[in-house]
């Protein structure tokens, strides 16, 4: 598959749809494209995010994702990296909203500036500069 054929879309299973939508729209600036009882689609730039309720998953069997599997730490071993044009403005916005930040804004050894936070469902996010 040619590399120019890809874009990113990711889906997260969440406990509280309203809380997750509020976080991604108010804190991270995603636009709600579609909202239904069992699914929401949001966009920021070329990044598409789907949200679905954990409660609608099967308890034990019925696919890779089940409620019993998601009772442990969600997103364990996964870091969702979101690139922004102005990481300083993004950091200030999150601070102004009063949302907890996992570490201060800092320039990393690899040359990018970033900060990290955890969404209401425990998914680990890194907000980073593009260059």
Language-model segments: what does each one mean?
Residues 12-16:
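Short, surface-exposed ligand-recognition loops at beta-strand->loop->(often short) alpha-helix junctions
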Residues 18-33, 38:
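N-terminal first-folded block
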Residues 20-25, 94, 119-122:
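Conserved active-site tyrosine of GNAT-family acetyltransferases
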Residues 1-9, 31-85, 89-118, 129-131:
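Vicinal oxygen chelate
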